[in-house]
Design a protein with these regions (language model features):
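Extended C-terminal subregions enriched in glycine
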Residues: 142, 190, 224, 233-284
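Short, small-residue-biased leader/transition segments that mark boundaries at the very start
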Residues: 1-7
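Alpha-helical support elements that line or immediately flank enzyme active sites
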Residues: 6, 214-236
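Active-site rim segments in enzyme catalytic domains, especially the processed small/beta chain
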Residues: 10-12, 144-210, 234, 238
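Extended C-terminal regions of large enzymes
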Residues: 38-41, 201-219
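Short, small/polar residue-rich loop motifs at catalytic or cofactor-binding pockets
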Residues: 23, 130-133, 194-196
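Non-catalytic beta-strand/loop surface segments
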Residues: 11-37, 192
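Internal maturation/activation junctions in enzymes
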Residues: 9, 57-152, 164-165, 172, ...
Length: 316
């Protein structure tokens, strides 16, 4: 508190005293015979579910994730999801409506109808109502699976260390916006929008299927969608899905792809109006770091880890 008094901080002693940890209900969407689970706002996991719901409306099961059409539809769906994410998502207690409104079939169908299947488009948010990260996945012989993620944000967080403690303060307040009319406006007693999201999937019988995460700021929701498409819908081996070329939506029509992308695919996406930028994943580190544990039908597990950055799959 003495540190707080010495700095221009919005939080008050009452905010700290009234803070609570919530046991939340996961957001869920049926997908590829199972379901994908994400934490509700104030995180970005809902963008994965929005994009997957839009893709189902587009008949994505007909297109391989590496095909031009599969990539085109996936990119457009994620652009729509990110537009809604930026406009609406905040601490759910301060959102204009319940987060589930963004996942209704009626709304997702209306969003999917905006996609031109032959050409890239610019999207804005819709109207669902009328009016620095570490990831850990673990599983045991009993079938229990855990998906866990944590981050101080932006390196060592705020750069502020509480005197005489060695405790560095995180920097997630950076996720607030300064527009007082925005649902994610800076204020005390309020959680900021943030990017850290552990992913989870269930099979068609409601049993744990996959615990997964893709570290990397705004790449996380995009990476979750790409993992779900490859592993759940197209049956790819989890390690093959992690190693496959990734893409990420930046802004407007700009899409960054890894340099391992097929040249003909890049050319075809550009012909559809996507502004493609090629980056080396081993130099730019902007495509996230994935970790996956997948439960096989007989109860065994397949663990897969990232090749682009530090990561390890262990059996103990």
């Amino acid at each position: 508190l003495s540190l707080h008094d010495a700095l221009p901080i919005y939080l008050t002693e009452a905010d700290l005293a009234n803070h609570r940890v919530d046991w939340v209900e996961l957001l869920s969407r049926d997908f590829a015979g199972g379901s994908v689970q994400e934490l509700p706002p104030n995180g970005q996991g809902i963008a994965t579910l929005i994009a997957l719901g839009i893709l189902e409306q587009c008949g994505i099961e007909k297109h391989h994730p590496d095909s031009v059409q599969g990539l085109h539809l996936s990119i457009e769906a994620m652009k729509l999801a990110l537009a809604d994410l930026d406009r609406y998502v905040a601490d759910e207690e301060h959102m204009e409506f319940a987060a589930k409104a963004l996942l209704s079939d009626h709304y997702l169908k209306s969003r999917a109808a905006l996609i031109n299947h032959d050409k890239a488009s610019d999207f804005v948010y819709g109207s669902p109502t009328q009016s620095g990260t570490v990831y850990l996945s673990a599983a045991d012989s009993s079938g229990m699976m855990i998906s866990f993620i944590q981050s101080n944000f932006m390196g060592f967080g705020s750069g502020i260390v509480v005197p005489d403690t060695g405790i560095s303060l995180q920097n997630r307040g950076c996720g607030f916006v300064l527009d007082p009319k925005h649902p994610n406006a800076l204020a005390g007693s309020k959680r900021p929008f943030h990017t850290i999201i552990p992913g989870f999937a269930m099979d068609g019988n409601g049993k744990p299927l996959m615990s997964f995460g893709v570290m990397g700021g705004p790449m996380q929701a995009q990476g979750h969608m790409q993992m779900a498409l490859r592993i759940m819908l197209h049956g790819q081996n989890p390690q093959a899905a992690i190693d496959a070329p990734r893409w990420r939506v930046v802004q407007g029509r700009e899409v960054v792809v890894e340099s391992t992308f097929d040249r003909n695919t890049i050319a075809a996406l550009r012909e559809r109006g996507h502004q493609i930028v090629v980056e080396d994943p081993l130099q730019d580190y902007n495509f996230g770091g994935a970790q996956v544990i997948y439960r096989m039908p007989e109860g065994h597990y397949v663990a897969a880890t990232e090749s682009r950055k530090d990561g390890q799959a262990l059996v103990s």
